[in-house]
């Protein structure tokens, strides 16, 4: 079913969305791999699936499987249904099983669709998966899918995907939340870099220089505190 769905969707995406894919040379051709991508549209998993010549698995809400045609398409493209109330532990266990058998897994670290504007903040699950499985992480940006849908209409729009070099981390059994968070925050800037390369809005920059105290002019010395 995967090959049939891919054979139908890939030429359609190239024609209708003028799909552009950059950095495919960074994608491992075999073995487990985690794709960490930003999430803008329900179309993201479908266009991401065109990157590989093998199935790419990802999480989808169980409600999406209620329509028979959509359930067929989701199953064909590697989606596995989860309940909204399902615990993170169960989802991580399913994701680990996919990677342990040598397959590809698509993860949206933001946890939900984020639009418009800059990318959102990541959750630490992707870092935990990278540590627990030792699978390389390919940072990916998807740009343009948020403009494809207007209401219930699907309209032509340029869609671009950019992959960065894979990131590898030593395998760690039962990593601490702090370590998983640190690895996630090593991965996410690489996703944001691909996003900005495609023209995406960068996140707000924090001024490293502290603000001047009220009433102090630029270049004027600050008043000393009274003893």
Task: Indicate where each model-derived feature is located.
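Non-catalytic C-terminal accessory region of glycerolipid acyltransferases
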Residues: 90-227
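Onset of an N-terminal alpha helix
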Residues: 1-9, 184
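Catalytic core of membrane glycerolipid acyltransferases/transacylases, capturing the structured
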Residues: 5, 14-15, 27-86, 93-94
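A structural micro-motif
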Residues: 17, 54-56, 77, 103, ...
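Residue-level "edge-of-site" marker
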Residues: 25, 87, 143
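A short, well-structured juxtamembrane/interface segment
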Residues: 11-31, 168-169
């Amino acid at each position: 079913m995967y090959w049939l769905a891919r054979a139908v969707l890939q030429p359609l995406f190239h024609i209708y969305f003028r799909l552009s894919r950059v950095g495919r040379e960074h994608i491992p051709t075999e073995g487990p791999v985690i794709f960490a991508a930003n999430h803008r549209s329900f179309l993201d998993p479908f266009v991401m699936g065109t990157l590989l010549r093998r199935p790419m698995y990802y999480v989808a809400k169980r409600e999406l499987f209620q329509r028979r045609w959509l359930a067929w398409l989701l199953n064909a493209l590697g989606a596995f249904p989860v309940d909204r109330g399902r615990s993170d532990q169960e989802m991580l266990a399913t994701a680990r099983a996919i990677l342990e058998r040598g397959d590809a897994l698509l993860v949206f670290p933001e946890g939900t669709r984020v639009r418009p504007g800059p990318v959102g903040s990541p959750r630490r699950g992707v870092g935990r998966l990278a540590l627990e499985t030792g699978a390389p992480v390919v940072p990916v940006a998807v740009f343009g899918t948020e403009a494809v849908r207007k209401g219930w209409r699907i309209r032509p729009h340029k869609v671009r995907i950019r992959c960065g070099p894979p990131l590898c981390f030593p395998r760690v059994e039962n990593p601490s939340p702090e370590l998983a968070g640190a690895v996630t925050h090593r991965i996410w800037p690489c996703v944001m870099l691909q996003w900005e390369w495609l023209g995406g809005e960068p996140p707000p920059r924090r001024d490293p220089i502290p603000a001047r105290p009220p009433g102090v002019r630029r270049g004027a010395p600050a008043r000393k505190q009274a003893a």
